[in-house]
Amino acid sequence: MQDLLNEILDEVRPLLGQGKVADYIPALGGVRPDQLGIAVYGNDGQVFSAGDAETQFSIQSISKVFSLVQAIGHSGEDIWQRLGHEPSGQPFNSLVQLEFERGRPRNPFINAGALVICDINQARFAAPSLSMRDFVRRLCGNRAITSDSKVAESEYQHRSRNAAAAYLMKSFDNFHGDVEDVLRSYFHHCALSMNCIDLAKAFGFLANQGFCTHSGEQILTARQATQVNSIMATSGLYDEAGNFAYRVGLPGKSGVGGGIVAIVPERASVCVWSPELNAAGNSLVGMAALEKLSARIDWSVF
């Protein structure tokens, strides 16, 4: 596996320079674009990594999976009364579909859906940001995980569209908390700084029927883990879930920080990171690396 990861990174490195770092979030725009890392965490507890796998980056929308898992953990099926689990077919921050469907987001991985999940968690936890941080620390076994306050503040200062979505949902009685408080929590979640190894380990439970190997915790039931994986497969890559399924063939979740996490059910979790994004907002080189890895080991679930 180690030789394979090194080989794959060498093969995709020539693609560096073809994408663009997410500069619409000012604090992310200064990230060095030529970085590339990958980590694989097996269900047996083994970790393999290559490249810049220990370099921290902003996980951004990957955090939406952690928020969803938290909500399922304390509220179960009740959360689906407030949002769906269908692909949206619209931009991740679209307001048009949200109004047409009367404030009920299509799924938890578009921004409106993630805000509803955050609203649900906000009502459950006294300190939602700390609760999320501690949850992620537990999942990856790294007590040093923190949220980058500069990134969170940068996103908060450019919150207008997310605030509009929240207030629109509130007008349909599908958003119950204080909008500004929920947005603060949401951006702190997105601003968590992790590396490929941290994220591969943190997502290991989704490859292992909901069981976290290194902590010994049953995070979700096997059925719930399967359900989360199914939503990742259909809605985890912005408007490129179909292309990711075609090329990589695994449940996945991406973020505009350049990270992509992929789940190989019953076998492993993988995280790849390269900050240059394609037109759909996903890591250009990261997707190419996952495509090669999945093909070489025949990991596609299809």
Curated annotation (Swiss-Prot):
Matching entries from InterPro entries are given as: Beta-lactam/transpept-like (IPR012338), Glutaminase (IPR015868)
| Molecular function, one GO term | glutaminase activity
Please cite one Gene Ontology biological process associated with this protein. glutamate biosynthetic process
Q: Where does substrate bind?
A: S61, N111, E155, N162, Y186, Y238, V256
Query: Would the keyword Repeat be found if you checked this record's keyword annotation?
Result: no
* Keywords noted in UniProt: Hydrolase
Give the top-level enzyme category: hydrolase
Give the EC number: 3.5.1.2
Catalyses which reaction(s): L-glutamine + H2O = L-glutamate + NH4(+)
Q: Which protein family is named in the record? A: Belongs to the glutaminase family.
Per its UniProt record, what NCBIfam families does this chain match? Gln_ase (TIGR03814), PRK00971.1-1 (NF002132), PRK00971.1-2 (NF002133)
> Could you describe the subunit structure of this protein?
Homotetramer.
| Protein name, as recorded | Glutaminase
